[in-house]
C-alpha cells in the first residue's frame, strides 16, 4: 500500500464534514492531527460548493435537522459529479422515521465510497435488525456476512465497528483488531473515525484498502494513547497526540489485520 499517512501530511486533503454538534470540535481536531484540512459546515447554501471542491465529503447523521438533511444531499450529489469520495455515518438508522427517510434518500441518491457504522447500524441496513439505538451498538458480535450484505447492496466499502472491526467491499473482507475499549467511554469516537476515513480515501484509490488503513491507524493511536492515559479525561488529549504522531512505519509495526 502507498504510504498513506505520509501522503496525507504532504497533500493536506480538504475534508468537508456535515456532522453533529457533539462531534464537530473533536472530529476537526482529529483531522488536523492526522494532517488534513477540515471544514465543518451544515448550511445547505454552502453544501454544493464544498462538495465540489473537497477531497472527501463526510456525512454524519448525528444531530439531524431538515437543513442538514438537505445539505447532505446537495454535498453528496455535487461530490459525485466531481469525483469526490463520500463517506456516510448513518447514526441510529431505523431509530425514527425522519432519520431513516433521510438516510434512505442519501443511499438512493449518492454513490458512496464507504459506510462507517457500528455493528447494530449495519445490521439495520442489512435488514437484520429493526432499529439501532445510536452510537452504542446493541449488537456485540460483528458478523462479516452482515457487513458483506450491505457492501453488495449499496456497492460500497463497509466499515463495521465493534469488538472486532470488519472492513469489506463485498468481495474482500478484513478483520481489524487494533483499538482499545476506552474508545467506548468517550463521546464521538465513532464520529471521529468516520471523519478519519476521509483523508485516507482521498489519497488511496482502493477504498477497501483505505478503510483498512484508516481503522487500523485509528485503533493503534487509541492503544498507544492508553499507555499514557489514566481514564477518559486524559485519554482524549492523548488520542489526539498519538494521531498527530502516527507514521506509516508505526502502523506497519503495530497493525493487526486478518484478511478472510
UniProtKB/Swiss-Prot annotation:
GO molecular function: ATP binding; hydroxyethylthiazole kinase activity; magnesium ion binding
Pathway: Cofactor biosynthesis; thiamine diphosphate biosynthesis; 4-methyl-5-(2-phosphoethyl)-thiazole from 5-(2-hydroxyethyl)-4-methylthiazole: step 1/1
Domain of life of the organism encoding this protein: Bacteria
EC annotation from Swiss-Prot or TrEMBL: 2.7.1.50
InterPro entries in alphabetical order: Hyethyz_kinase (IPR000417), Ribokinase-like (IPR029056)
Coiled-coil region list: none
Gene Ontology biological process terms in this record: thiamine biosynthetic process; thiamine diphosphate biosynthetic process
Name listed for the protein in its UniProt record: Hydroxyethylthiazole kinase 2
Organism: Oceanobacillus iheyensis (strain DSM 14371 / CIP 107618 / JCM 11309 / KCTC 3954 / HTE831)
Amino acid at each position: 500500500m502507498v504510504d498513506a499517512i505520509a501522503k496525507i501530511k504532504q497533500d493536506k486533503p480538504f475534508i468537508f464534514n456535515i456532522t453533529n454538534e457533539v462531534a464537530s470540535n473533536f472530529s476537526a481536531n482529529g483531522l488536523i492531527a492526522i494532517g488534513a484540512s477540515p471544514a465543518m459546515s451544515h448550511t445547505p447554501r454552502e453544501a454544493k460548493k464544498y462538495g465540489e471542491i473537497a477531497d472527501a465529503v463526510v456525512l454524519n447523521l448525528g444531530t439531524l435537522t431538515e437543513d442538514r438533511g438537505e445539505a447532505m444531499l446537495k454535498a453528496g450529489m455535487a461530490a459525485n459529479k466531481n469525483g469526490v469520495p463520500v463517506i456516510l455515518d448513518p447514526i441510529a438508522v431505523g431509530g425514527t422515521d425522519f432519520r431513516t427517510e433521510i438516510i434512505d434518500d442519501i443511499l438512493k441518491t449518492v454513490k458512496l465510497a464507504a459506510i462507517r457504522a457500528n455493528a447494530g447500524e449495519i445490521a439495520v441496513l442489512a435488514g437484520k435488525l429493526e432499529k439501532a439505538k445510536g452510537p452504542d451498538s446493541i449488537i456485540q458480535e460483528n458478523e462479516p456476512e452482515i457487513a458483506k450484505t450491505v457492501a453488495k447492496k449499496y456497492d460500497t466499502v463497509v466499515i463495521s465497528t465493534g469488538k472486532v472491526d470488519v472492513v469489506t467491499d463485498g468481495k474482500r473482507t478484513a478483520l481489524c483488531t487494533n483499538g482499545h475499549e476506552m474508545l467506548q467511554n468517550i463521546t464521538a469516537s465513532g464520529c471521529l473515525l468516520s471523519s478519519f476515513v476521509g483523508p485516507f480515501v482521498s489519497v488511496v484509490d482502493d477504498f477497501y484498502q483505505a478503510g483498512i488503513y484508516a481503522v487500523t491507524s485509528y485503533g493503534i493511536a487509541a492503544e498507544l494513547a492508553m499507555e499514557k492515559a489514566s481514564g477518559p479525561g486524559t485519554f482524549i488529549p492523548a488520542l489526539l497526540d498519538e494521531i498527530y504522531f502516527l507514521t506509516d512505519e508505526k502502523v506497519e509495526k503495530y497493525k493487526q489485520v486478518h484478511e478472510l
